[in-house]
Amino acid sequence: MIHLPQGSFTQGLIVGQLLTLAIIYVFLRFFLFCSPIPKSVANSPKQTGNETPDETPSTPLSNNKKRYKKPLTILEPHILNLLYDVNEHEPESLDWFNVLIAQALIQFRYDACSNDVALRKLETVLNKGAQDKSMVDHIYVRDLSLGDGFPVFSHCRVLPHQHNSSQLRAEMLVSLTDNINCTVDTKLLLNFPKPAFATLPLSITVRICKFVGKIMIYFSPSNGAGQPAYMNLSFDPNFVISLQVSSLVGARSKLQDIPKITQLIESRIRQWFTNRCVSPQFQQIAIPNLWPTSAKEGHARSHAPQEESSNED
């Protein structure tokens, strides 16, 4: 027969209750009712013994500068290797891109033909760009056809930029076989012995039948001072463009397809394209800023009360 010491059960019960109360107290004291760590302390980097804390007072602007790191405007070489290996990546066919361009071009032609908006725009450009108004009368665009073919992009490659090895450029071949034609009517002015002494009717039709070339696309990053980023497009100097120019001069006795007029029109078209689109020249497309600036936000807020008051009236 085993004899238990008296009071063992009572002592165990008391000790167990005390331990339970102690655990509950620790949990409530250090997990529920403790004061949170300040965000400035939590977000600040750990300082070593050799570093001295900054004694300048913090402002919201300075906090933003510490919180947001300045994004990269160019890709680092190791990032480029992860995204695209310029040395081993095979050229792409761009079949999917051709389908998207074809759909966009269909809509563009439809919009251009609506109410002859493209015809009027071209007429304005031709009259504005006429160099010698004393020899040529007002230019009228009689007919304009944007064709029914589609450009084919192929053999796309991504290469380092020629002037900046840390940036990339995309090169692709483009070919277009179509019948894009424009017919203009004007008058040649004879200014002797007096201004506009006689006029000579002139009708010119220009057809673009084929174009083959290499297009280069690269980006110009923003400088952060209000200047947007740009997408630049340029063509290689070794391009091929096939033109057909027909001319008709005179009212009654008409002269057709004068070689000198054909050569002059072809050289002017090639010169216009070279001076604007052929490397080192390029065309730029501004990339819109998706993040509104404080000035734009303030402008929107200033107009909001006026709109509400007008609606109430």
From Swiss-Prot:
Cite the record's Polar residues compositional bias ranges: 42-63
Task: Could you list this entry's UniProt keywords, alphabetically sorted.
Answer: Endoplasmic reticulum, Lipid transport, Lipid-binding, Membrane, Transmembrane, Transmembrane helix, Transport
Which CDD domains does the entry mention? SMP_Mmm1 (cd21671)
Lumenal face of the membrane: 1-12
List the GO molecular function terms: lipid binding
* GO CC annotation terms, alphabetical: cytoplasm; endoplasmic reticulum; endoplasmic reticulum membrane; ERMES complex
Q: Organism's domain of life? A: Eukaryota
Chief localization: endoplasmic reticulum
What does the UniProt entry say about where the protein is found? Endoplasmic reticulum membrane
| PROSITE patterns to which the protein is assigned, alphabetical | SMP
Annotated region (Disordered) at 42-65
Which protein family is named in the record? Answer: Belongs to the MMM1 family.
Q: What is this protein called?
A: Maintenance of mitochondrial morphology protein 1
Which species does this protein come from? Schizosaccharomyces pombe (strain 972 / ATCC 24843) (Fission yeast)
